Amino acid sequence: MANKKKVALACSECGSRNYTITENPNRTERLEVQKFCKYCGKHTLHRETK
């Protein structure tokens, strides 16, 4: 079984890393999703960081 890397999803407004996901090796572009940021108190765009 291959080892999958964990990557973080960081808030685009405050920069806090609120979520972690396992990386899919077949996906080449970085993931961007709308998630709730508990520090901003609202739904913001979260981007994948390495």
From Swiss-Prot:
Single Gene Ontology BP annotation: translation
Keywords, alphabetical: Ribonucleoprotein, Ribosomal protein
Membrane-crossing segments per the record: none
Any Pfam family matching the protein: Ribosomal_L33
One cellular component (GO) term of this entry: ribonucleoprotein complex
Domain of life: Bacteria
Molecular function terms, GO-annotated: structural constituent of ribosome
Coiled coil regions, renumbered to chain: none
Protein family: Belongs to the bacterial ribosomal protein bL33 family.
Protein's recorded name: Large ribosomal subunit protein bL33B
Organism: Ligilactobacillus salivarius (strain UCC118)
Organismal lineage: Bacteria, Bacillati, Bacillota, Bacilli, Lactobacillales
